[in-house]
Regions:
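Membrane-interface helix caps and helix-loop-helix hairpins in membrane proteins
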Residues: 56-64, 110-121, 170-175
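Membrane-interfacial loop-to-transmembrane alpha-helix junctions, especially the N-terminal start
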Residues: 29-44, 89-99, 144-157, 205
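Internal transmembrane alpha-helix with an interfacial aromatic "cap," most often the third helix
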Residues: 19-30, 52-99, 134-138, 195-202
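Hydrophobic transmembrane alpha-helical segments in integral membrane proteins
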Residues: 1-18, 110-125
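C-terminal transmembrane-bundle signature of multipass membrane proteins
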Residues: 133-205
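Short, aromatic-rich membrane-interface segments at the entry and exit
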Residues: 12, 34-36, 63, 92-96, ...
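Hydrophobic alpha-helical transmembrane segments of multi-pass membrane proteins
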Residues: 11-23, 34-58, 69-75, 104-107, ...
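Generic alpha-helical transmembrane segments
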Residues: 72-77, 120-135, 188
Length: 205
């Protein structure tokens, strides 16, 4: 059993469950769709990690094919994409070559690396979701006005997620802290940081 793998995943579960609960409470108080969607994204991501940890604890090995976790993680990223789509309401988006190039690069890397396991279909869905999220985020940064910090952080989250899968290809010893865990911790904290930025936008709206 990989002790540091468990520590890393337990940390992610605790952070995301707390963030999901907080976002849900604020969503009800503020009647905010953005915060509700963010809460659902956190919950889905945490569910995927919980399945992974339970498999690791009960069976004692890493799940080689774990579609339950993959579907949960994909659902989380679809919720993140929904947040970015909501930001386009009332905004005139122009075709952006930098945004298109960034989106195409992220989508290509995610698909070619088979980020979501051996399934080409699931990997393609994630690649399209990641690419669309990056495209909208970069477009908002270029043309979107007041709230660019959340868009920048969303791009960082996508990059860290794809980077995590790339790094995992070269990680064989999960018993000690190394680059894989640094990227995963950065991803967890970056996702959690979306909450205060989103809450600030909701308060100022």
């Amino acid at each position: 059993m990989e002790s540091f793998e468990l520590i890393d995943n337990f940390f992610q579960i605790v952070v995301l469950i707390c963030a999901a609960a907080a976002a849900g409470i604020f969503a009800l108080r503020r009647r905010s769709r953005d915060l509700l969607i963010l809460s659902l994204a956190y919950a889905c991501f945490a569910m995927g990690t919980i399945y992974y940890v339970l498999y690791l604890v009960i069976i004692g090995i890493w799940p080689q094919v774990f579609y339950v976790a993959e579907i949960s993680l994909l659902a989380a990223w679809l919720f993140y994409l929904s947040m970015q789509i909501l930001r386009t309401e009332g905004m005139k988006l122009r075709v952006s070559l930098p945004a298109g190039a960034a989106a195409a690069f992220i989508a290509a890397v995610a698909f070619l690396d088979h980020d979501f396991g051996p399934s080409y279909f699931v990997s393609a869905l994630f690649a399209l979701t990641a690419g669309a999220t990056v495209y909208l985020s970069v477009s908002h940064i270029q043309h979107g006005g007041l709230y660019r910090k959340r868009d920048i952080l969303m791009v960082i989250c996508v990059v860290l997620q794809v980077l995590l899968y790339l790094v995992s290809n070269y990680t064989h010893d999960y018993t000690r802290f190394q680059l894989y865990y640094a990227v995963d911790l950065a991803l967890t904290l970056s996702m959690a940081a979306l909450l205060p930025l989103t809450l600030r936008e909701v308060k100022q709206a």
